[in-house]
Amino acid sequence: MIKLRDISNVNPEEFDEVWIICRSIKKLDRTILDNPKVKHVPDLSPSMELFYAYRKWANQGVWNTFLWNEKYVPNFLEQMRNDVKAKTYLQQLTDESKSKNIALVCFCRDEKMCHRSIVGGILYHMGASIEIKDSYEGYHI
């Protein structure tokens, strides 16, 4: 079973694996990174271009559900659609979700407007055993 979490609310000991799906892990405590259950998988994170666009919108105070739905989501889905390595990881997660307890984590506190919700929707449509909110079911590649 896959569960979506923000990194500040995850205890690696509660999971078989913890997948950190963000580009940078510089701000993370070494005790988390040194845990053998923890994997850093930047291939399931937004491209630098999309991440910087998000940061720009957030810093300008204009980040909202319109930009999320009209700009961020379509760009991230397109990125996942065209990334062979990302698709390999998505398939691995789908397969492992049947026998392992896995946390997908990122720094974002608002899960609804975080790429992990999109990844969750993609995994749901791929047949993964995943705990998601209904609103994520619209995300697929």
What does each model-identified segment do?
Residues 1-141:
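Residues lining hydrophobic/aromatic ligand-binding pockets adjacent to catalytic sites
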